[in-house]
Amino acid sequence: MFNKDKVKIGIAPIAWTNDDMPELGAENTFEQCISEMALSGFKGTEVGNKYPRDTKVLKRALELRDMQIASAWFSAFLTTKPYEETEKAFIKHRDFLYEMRSKVIVISEQGHSIQGKMETPIFEEKPIFTEEEWKDLAKGLNKLGKLAKEKNMKVVYHHHMGTGVQTTEEIDKLMEMTDPTLVYLLYDTGHLVFSGEDPIVVLRKYINRIKHVHLKDIREDVVKIVKQKKMSFLQAVKLGAFTVPGDGDIDFKPVFNILAENNYEGWLLVEAEQDPARANPLEYAIKARKYIQEKAAI
């Protein structure tokens, strides 16, 4: 059983409005997003492209709905640009999240990333880091981890399709090369299964470094089409590769059990990017919240 005082349930705005494809959900407002999240029973959210960056305005809107900011995505370019560029942007990002009382900072290395390229096949063109790039990535993440620690925050690394840290082997390498007291892991079920990995293996191995969880389900039949037709990540999203927990092919019960048995503390955050014109965000948010209640008793 989860400790209900230590575990919070949130949902990402990506089901309402998509940062990589702004045309998806362009009609959905910030207020609609967070109102429907709260109506569905969620207590937190990550930051999307419609969210105000004025912390006073954002806090007020969230407080009215008894909501919090769990975290926000940060794109690092430690493998392709001078470290100082990433650090400058990171400090601004960190300070914004600190103002919003967030405890974790989601980081993904976007050097060589193809996740935002509409015509680039996700499996065939996946980037592979050189040894030098791995060293730059690890060294840079350790530095960013120290900057987060200054504010009593944690860097959580987001393994992601179409990036240099996608597979279990790549996650292993990153975890091995970084300081476990400075760099933690964001565990994303959907990205692991999409990549062909066993999510339970990664969960068991890094349970003590996992400080943020994205609950994302997969439609295996759609992934097969993506592979057959050599589609891109964005094309896969539009086709419906991802969905909310309980609507796809992942069994989340063992995931919840392992997290609970190991006294996981932090956010369980539903993140399922779909085309809102095809998958009504409110309907799917309610479906996800009911499923989590049934399977995790929280």
Swiss-Prot record:
Pathway given in the UniProt record: Polyol metabolism; myo-inositol degradation into acetyl-CoA; acetyl-CoA from myo-inositol: step 2/7
Pfam families the UniProt entry points to: AP_endonuc_2
Enzyme Commission identifier(s): 4.2.1.44
Reported cofactor(s): glutathione; Co(2+); Mn(2+)
The keyword Lyase is assigned to this record: yes
InterPro entries for this protein: IolE, IolE/MocC, IolE/XylAMocC-like, Xyl_isomerase-like_sf, Xyl_isomerase-like_TIM-brl
Keyword Lyase: yes
One annotated GO molecular function: myo-inosose-2 dehydratase activity
Xref: SUPFAM superfamilies: Xylose isomerase-like
The reaction(s) this protein catalyses: scyllo-inosose = 3D-3,5/4-trihydroxycyclohexane-1,2-dione + H2O
Signal peptide: none
Keyword entries, A-Z: Cobalt, Lyase, Manganese
One GO term of the biological process aspect: inositol catabolic process
Family of this protein: Belongs to the IolE/MocC family.
NCBIfam families: myo_inos_iolE (TIGR04379)
Name this polypeptide is given: Inosose dehydratase
Encoding gene, per UniProt annotation: iolE
